[in-house]
């Protein structure tokens, strides 16, 4: 009988603790402004997108990317590409805001503005 009583006390205590924990949790506050900032221009290769270059100005301040694959194309050139037309783009790797070109190319596309 004592064993059954001990189990009930432990079970009720555990349930009470769980109830208190979940009853006091608040939803996290999301203070991030998703409409701010300046997104990088990206080009598509049919399965993935990569940034065109690794740096740009955002509200007068430089923004850079690091340690990510990129296309060795300036944002200005990428913006002038005709959407949906295949281009041969040099691949590179972002290092301190510069897209360091390697010896590979792949087909890339500029997406439409609606995407």
Swiss-Prot record:
Residue positions the entry lists as glycosylated: 45, 72, 103
One MF term in the entry's GO annotations: C-C chemokine binding
Keywords in alphabetical order: Disulfide bond, Glycoprotein, Secreted, Signal
Domain of life of the native organism: Eukaryota
Signal peptide: 1-25
InterPro entries the UniProt entry points to: EVA_Class_A
Subcellular location: Secreted
Gene3D superfamilies linked: 2.30.130.100
Disulfide bonding pattern of the chain: 38-58, 54-94, 70-99, 89-108
One GO term describing the cellular component: extracellular region
Pfam families in alphabetical order: EVA_Class_A
Chief subcellular location: secreted
Function: Salivary chemokine-binding protein which binds to host chemokine CCL2.
Protein name in UniProt: Evasin P1183
Originating species: Amblyomma triste (Neotropical tick)
